[in-house]
Amino acid sequence: GAQAVGIAWTDGDQIGVFDQEAVNQRCYSKVGAEREALASFTAAGEAFAEPTYAYYPYDAANDNKEITSLTGNLPAVQNMDSGILHGDYKYGRAKGSGASGHEFAFTHMFSLARVTVDASGTPLAGDKLREVSVSVTRNDAPVAVAGQFEFNARNGVWKQTDAGSGTVSLQWTDGPQLNSSLTAYMSMFPTVKSGDTFTITVSTQNYRACFSAQSLADFQRENIYGLPLQLKNYSSLVVYDKEGNLEYPTEGVKTGTFTCATLNVDGLPSGINSDGPGKQGTVTLGNKANLQGWDFLAVSEDFEYHTQLATAMSNYNAGTYRGSLGVLNLSQRADTDGLGFFWKKGLSATGETMVQYTAEIGGLTDGANTLIKKGFRHYVVTVADGVDVDVYITHMNTWSDKDPSSFEPVQIAQLCQLRDYVLAQLKQNKRPAIVMGDTNMRYTRHKVQDNFITPIAQAGYEAIDPWVKFHRNGEFPTWGGKSLMIRSNFKGDTKNDICCSDDQRGEVVDKVWYINHPLSSVQLQAVGCRNDVENFVKSTEAAEYKGVTIEDANGNILTNQTVSFERKIGLADHFPVVVDFKYTIIKK
């Protein structure tokens, strides 16, 4: 249902006011600290003789803009700690004047959703609320309900100026307990139509509940729409604990496990890379991989020694091999992506699709990126009866510390191309997805969160990095900091690197992310993650460095330290990144 929105002005509110000609603008501030429906405002400086138009909230960034092209942001994440409503944009028009000044009538530009959470009869009852997120889709495509916009303060007409977010989240740092029904309000663009799908997630300190519902109305501005979330009444309700284990429902549920890995096999011809494993080293590498029991493996730089690798991996089937590079003719682009995919015999991998990246940079002496057709591949892997997973494997552009301003935009463009493809398939197929490979990226030097993690969240999903979950306490490394090196990869660079306490806490460029579709009957949960150093050691050597910055096992950063350790040298120049998964099949 819907009802008209009321207005309650609070202490600290400010409005932008235009004069009769709608040319000059000034900031007016609320008088008094009371919360009230009718409030008085006073100008900062000389007041207008005929104030005529107004908008809320005032933003100094709009001071020099025309009344028809003001800008605003309805935030996708709305923090509820202070109880203040976010994104509550209004426009006002003078009604007349009297002894107390000019009277304005304000109209809300957007819609409000009254979210009432009742967790009684579910595991969430009595737990502390952390977040309520509402994602909106129409025919499986996200509906933008938050984002940047431009508006006209004369009449409240607005238009979106970015891609927007299909999800709005209310968040609490130390939220209330769900002992009884709780009501909160979220601002949304009035873009929701009758029949649109709401995918709702309620997260507490120890649980996460997911379910879906249909919109019964076309949202209009200046209206409140009720979202009565009595959780136990939703037949689509699924509840997980904080570790991702299924709590509800329990009937008709099947579970199982599988393991995947990603590895750069360093397979350039020895004429180009004399330090690579070569034929015999690749045989050893393949034999080691063959014995690990992984269910499927993504490899990159699978060029010259594919035959040796595939023969050694006798327990596996392989995807298309696209060839090597011609050592004697490096002026021509080789028709290969260097990618390889292996899956255990008895499983199936279908729908092989190859996509070349449109952005690229770097010739023979700058990463050799343009000598091949770098890109990504897409497979549908059936790991068990009824368990299909979309798997994406990739090898991205190299990074250059000599010219990062040229190389980083290309890498980000490739990441965004991959992200958009994955999101499109996710919406269409409603299957869980795994994205893995040599990204040549680090969270510390590339804006991976801004361009991959966050946009996927804004689309209503969650991209999870098991390494962040298991080895970084769920916190992404800070962008712009020094590289967090695993022990075996630390070479004493005190200017750019931090030596981590072991071979697990450090970051490598080989990534594995996974994304669940909330409406899928198959859900994935990472239950383990490791850089498999121990099984892929060629040799060891003693290492000692002085005056270095280290990170200890508790995450403390210590400067000017002396470290000594046994460095493990791999069979290739990368170690495998391995992730163990648990899958759950929910009969809905």
Language-model segments: which ranges?
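Sec-type signal peptide cleavage vicinity
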Residues: 1-254
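Short catalytic/ligand-binding loop motif for oxyanion handling, primarily in non-cytosolic enzymes
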Residues: 268-271, 305-308, 330-340, 350, ...
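Metal-dependent phosphoester-hydrolase catalytic domains
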Residues: 241-248, 424-433, 441-588
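Active-site beta-strand/loop signature of hydrolases that rely on acidic residues for catalysis
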Residues: 259-265, 285-309, 342, 379, ...
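Residues within well-ordered beta-strands of beta-sheet-rich folds
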Residues: 18, 53-55, 112-116, 259-261, ...
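Structured beta-strand-rich core segments of catalytic domains in phosphoester-bond hydrolases
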Residues: 299-399
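N-terminal, active-site-proximal structural segment of metallo-dependent hydrolase catalytic domains
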Residues: 235-314, 331-336, 573, 580-588
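Acidic/histidine-rich helix-loop elements
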Residues: 262-283, 361-370, 397-410
